[in-house]
Design a protein with these regions (language model features):
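Extracytoplasmic/periplasmic ligand-capture domains
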Residues: 60-63, 88-119, 130-132, 179, ...
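Bacterial N-terminal signal peptides
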Residues: 8-18
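N-terminal lobe/hinge region of extracytoplasmic solute-binding protein
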Residues: 30-79, 109, 116, 178-182
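Sec/Tat signal peptide C-region and signal peptidase I cleavage site
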Residues: 19-23
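Long beta-strand-rich cores associated with HINT superfamily self-processing modules
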Residues: 350, 497-522
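A generic structural motif
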Residues: 83-86, 137-143, 196
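Surface-exposed binding/hinge segments that line
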Residues: 76, 121-165
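Bacterial N-terminal signal peptides that target proteins for export
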Residues: 1-8
Length: 522
């Protein structure tokens, strides 16, 4: 399934030839703006992409999730539950203060406890028992047991400056007062709904970027974003709509860049509460009984989804049907799981077995600005469910509202997406582990599905050092989740970007749009 390509004139090719000399400025148009500049406020791709410009992590993430040295230039396992990290020397924050191990310790203490987070970074610190500063250039992380996924977790956590952030709030980051990192760009200003401005860090340890000034503009509407690209108002856009793909491919002034994504589009259902706020009977009368608690109902909804039709007719073939939560060729995928067939008759039988032969009504929320055709996909799923007697009131909204309200359990069903990092622990821990803010498990489990067998398999995997055994345990956890249909896997997206000719972009599986990946063609 893996693919990473540049497309010119409708064919896959290596980029050859030279483009015109570049201006010093770069303007990127993104589908969704961040919910905050605070790098620990919300596990959310727009926030993570923003953070990577201003801050660095101990471990850097390559385009396909490769683990590379970041602020730590080397590390070693001292014991099964102790990791030692040597920090890169000569690194300074944007205000000139030297980066030290104390900043790492401060960061790891702060990241999981930021107030009002819609999806907490506690999921990435859950294995950490304590942090020990050995000296200014060395830190030890003590874990709660063997922690083979620690490096994956540390890839997600931006290191901030104690002297700039101690005692400061998320609002201080948004205003720029605390947004002082070690990253390749310095924060200049943020006008929510309009633009985010940065300037290159001339002393960046990784080398100075080719762009003196960076502007990131949120343009949620697909047509408006494409129009800005065609008019030359921006240098790059993300999320090329499938309906405009052929037109952009044919334009000699542009280039398209595509790669398979880590993003899983899924449906989460309220499987915990006896009464759910968006549930009514087939006539629309509110009920105090929640049919989504029955696994047969959840399996019926899964069988009612025509994945090939969604992908071919609505997404222009720019997706892959999902039968589990990581791609089937990914380490840790279950060999037993394939995308479910479209079977409306089987779905009706399951509803009848569950004592809902006439169906019911439910409200399903979705984003309308987060991933390609998100609101349209939700509407199409609603129409498919209507054919088995489940009447769906689709309620699209901006992603920031969806996640905030979803975290408050305001919805009975949500169609959403999760972008992992290549490690199966990412979606399994975030979306399906039993919700527990004390342990950092299940921070995005907005349906509160809970299964002891799943938790046991996942928990064992998280502490298993042998890679083969670990991956088998991840597969077992996925088998359990799909059998109970705790979360419905729908499809994996394909990420796409367009740039003006003379630029190249290295597409990323995490779908982040990073100025660091935009380079002049030589």
């Amino acid at each position: 399934m893996a693919r990473n390509s540049v497309l010119l004139g409708g064919i896959f090719t290596a980029w050859l030839g030279a483009g015109p000399a570049l201006a010093a400025d770069l303007t990127m148009a993104v589908r969704t703006e961040p919910s905050s500049i605070d790098p620990h406020f919300h596990v959310y791709v727009p926030n993570g992409a923003t953070a990577k410009h201003v801050f660095d992590a101990l471990i850097s993430a390559g385009p396909r999730g490769e683990q590379m040295p970041g602020l730590s230039d080397r590390w070693k396992v001292v014991a099964d539950d102790v990791w030692e990290f040597h920090l890169r020397q000569g690194v300074r924050f944007h205000d000139g203060v030297t980066f030290t191990a104390d900043d790492v310790a401060f960061t790891l203490a702060r990241a999981p406890v930021v107030p009002n987070s819609p999806s907490s970074y506690s999921q990435y610190t859950k294995q950490i028992a304590s942090v020990e500063v050995i000296n200014p250039e060395t830190i030890r992380i003590h874990t709660k047991g063997p922690a083979p996924g620690l490096l994956w977790d540390l890839m997600q956590i931006s290191i901030i400056a104690r002297h700039a952030a101690d005692g400061r709030s998320t609002a201080d980051f948004n205003a720029g007062r605390a947004a002082i990192g070690t990253g390749p760009y310095r924060f200049v200003s943020w006008q929510p709904g309009d633009r985010l401005r940065m300037t290159a860090n001339p002393e960046y340890w990784g080398g100075v970027e080719p762009w003196a000034n960076l502007t990131i503009r949120p343009i949620a509407n697909d047509g408006a974003r494409v129009a800005a690209m065609l008019a030359g108002d921006v240098d790059m856009i993300e999320g090329v709509p499938s309906s405009d793909r052929a037109r952009l491919l044919a334009d000699p002034k542009l280039a398209l860049w595509e790669t398979d994504a880590f993003r899983i589009i899924y449906i989460v259902m309220d499987s915990a509460r006896d009464a759910s706020p968006g549930i009514a009977d087939a006539a629309g009368k509110p009920m105090d009984k929640n049919p989504l608690r029955d696994a047969r109902v959840r399996r019926a909804i899964n069988l009612a989804i025509n994945r090939p039709a969604l992908i071919d007719r609505l997404l222009g073939g720019q997706a892959h049907a999902a039968g589990q939560y990581v791609p089937s060729d990914n380490p840790g995928a279950s060999p037993n799981l394939k995308p479910s067939p479209y079977d409306p008759d089987g779905a009706k039988r399951l509803l009848a077995e569950a004592s809902w032969p006439d169906g019911f009504s439910v409200t399903m929320a979705s984003s309308n600005d987060r991933f390609p055709q998100d609101a349209q996909v939700a509407q199409a799923v609603g129409q498919m469910l209507a054919r088995i007697g489940v009447k769906v009131n689709v309620t699209p909204m901006p992603a920031s509202q969806l996640f905030s309200r979803g975290s408050k359990l305001e919805f009975s069903m949500m169609l959403s997406g999760w972008v992992g990092n290549g490690d199966p622990a990412s979606p399994l821990t975030a979306l399906m582990a039993t919700y527990d803010p004390k342990t950092g498990m299940g921070p995005s489990n907005r349906g509160r599905w809970s299964n002891a067998g799943f938790d046991a398999a996942l928990g064992e995997a998280l502490q298993t050092l042998d890679e083969g055994k670990r991956n088998a345990l991840f597969g077992r956890a996925a088998d359990i989740a799909v059998a109970d249909m705790g979360v419905i896997p729908v499809y994996f997206t394909i990420n796409s970007w367009a740039t003006r000719k003379g630029l190249k972009y290295e597409g990323r599986g995490d779908e982040m749009s990073l100025a660091m990946g935009v380079k002049p063609v030589k």
